[in-house]
From Swiss-Prot:
InterPro entries: ArgE/DapE_CS, LysK, Peptidase_M20, Peptidase_M20A, Peptidase_M42. Pfam families: Peptidase_M20 (PF01546). The active site is at residues 68, 117. It catalyses: [amino-group carrier protein]-C-terminal-gamma-(L-lysyl)-L-glutamate + H2O = [amino-group carrier protein]-C-terminal-L-glutamate + L-lysine; [amino-group carrier protein]-C-terminal-gamma-(L-ornithyl)-L-glutamate + H2O = [amino-group carrier protein]-C-terminal-L-glutamate + L-ornithine. Pathway: Amino-acid biosynthesis; L-lysine biosynthesis via AAA pathway; L-lysine from L-alpha-aminoadipate (Thermus route): step 5/5; Amino-acid biosynthesis; L-arginine biosynthesis. GO terms for molecular function: cobalt ion binding; hydrolase activity, acting on carbon-nitrogen (but not peptide) bonds, in linear amides; zinc ion binding. This is Putative [LysW]-lysine/[LysW]-ornithine hydrolase. It comes from Pyrococcus horikoshii (strain ATCC 700860 / DSM 12428 / JCM 9974 / NBRC 100139 / OT-3). One of its GO terms (cellular component) is cytoplasm. Belongs to the peptidase M20A family. LysK subfamily. Its EC number is 3.5.1.130, 3.5.1.132. The lineage of its organism: Archaea, Methanobacteriati, Methanobacteriota, Thermococci, Thermococcales. Zn(2+) 2 binds at residues 90, 118, 297. Catalyzes the release of L-lysine from [LysW]-gamma-L-lysine and the release of L-ornithine from [LysW]-L-ornithine. Its cofactor is Zn(2+); Co(2+).
Length: 325
């Protein structure tokens, strides 16, 4: 068994490696070398993902988390039982949970530390491994939570060009884009089954003979949502939801209860690599990991180290149950 001090030290060192999207190389190298120190072969693939395989008993389980973080450095420090730092919650705490569950368990596991999750998920889209039987993605769900659904993400570009007329005779490109946004947003609603979103970019100016406008929006889409065919789609990742009766979900519920906690099944308004990996391999996928997702991307990102350590034990119990133990 690996000591709690060593697990905390690993996480702190990983968080200390600043790895915003596009700059994951040092963190990937660190994880690879740590696997090798524990006697597990690992490699970095052609897109920068770090992959490790531990052969064991039972179904093949993919444990996938992301190495990259959003930008914004936070001084790394431990205060009592709390570790502060960018990525401590999203998602190096969950990634470290997957790391130690791989090492300490005797399940049949592929570990994947993925790049570009905060971008366009290049790591997940290009992951080349044998088809797993189950997928567990490292994202903050809370020690007693398991995320069974994520909304989709749709990024769209709208462009308007309006021939110049006297300012009193008509609307320009900017006004048309505003009308378009008001039409799209009039039916927004909160919740997992609602559509909502925001304007990511808005640009309008006049050229010699025309008014030009460009608007990029991001929509969070519910299950079953199909965007209009005429839209200029930059990227679309559909919503994903796993059946709560799945053996994977049941293994989490039982393991969390056995740890003395009340299980919570969660559906989130964000999007994660779960949305890509589940459909990519055609198997059940959930997300699990310590941390409060309300702290994601904020200047106050921090993780409770007791919860981190407990999450490792819960995930190891899940892996035992999946192989029939």
């Amino acid at each position: 068994m690996i000591s709690e001090e060593e697990k905390i030290k690993f996480l702190k060192e990983l968080v200390e490696i600043y790895s915003p999207t596009g700059r994951e190389e040092e963190a990937a190298k660190f994880i690879k070398e740590k696997f090798e120190e524990y006697g597990i072969e690992a490699y970095v693939d052609n897109v920068g993902n770090v992959i490790a395989r531990k052969s064991g008993e039972g179904p093949l389980v993919l444990l996938a988390g992301h190495i990259d973080t959003v930008p914004g450095y936070i001084p790394v420090r431990i205060e009592g039982e709390v570790l502060w730092g960018r990525g401590s919650v999203d998602a190096k705490g969950p990634l470290a949970t997957l790391f130690f569950s791989t090492i300490e368990g005797n399940a049949n596991v592929i570990f994947a530390g993925l790049v570009d999750e905060e971008g366009f998920s290049k790591g997940a889209r290009n992951l080349k491994i044998p088809r797993p039987d189950y997928i567990i993605v490292g994202e903050p769900s809370g020690t007693n939570g398991v995320t069974i659904g994520y909304k989709g993400s749709l990024t769209v570009r709208f462009v308007e060009r309006v021939e110049k007329v006297h300012s009193s005779l008509g609307v320009g490109a900017a006004e048309r884009l505003i009308e378009k946004w008001l039409e799209i947003s009039k039916d927004f609603s909160d919740g997992f089954n609602g559509l909502n979103g925001r304007i990511v970019r808005f640009l309008a100016y006049d050229r010699e003979f025309e008014f030009y406008g460009e608007m990029i929006i991001n929509l969070r889409t519910p299950p079953g949502y199909v965007p209009p065919l005429e839209w200029d789609i930059i990227d679309f990742v559909p919503a994903y939801e796993v059946d709560r009766r799945s053996p994977l979900v049941r293994a989490f519920v039982k393991s969390i209860r056995e740890a003395g906690l009340k299980p919570k099944l969660k559906k989130k308004s964000g999007t994660a690599d779960t949305n890509i990996l589940g459909p990519k391999f055609g198997v059940d996928a959930v997300a699990y990991g310590p941390g409060d997702s309300k702290l994601d991307h904020t200047p106050y990102e921090r993780i409770n180290l007791r919860e981190y350590l407990k999450s490792i034990e819960i995930l190891k119990a899940v892996l035992r149950k999946l192989k029939g133990g």
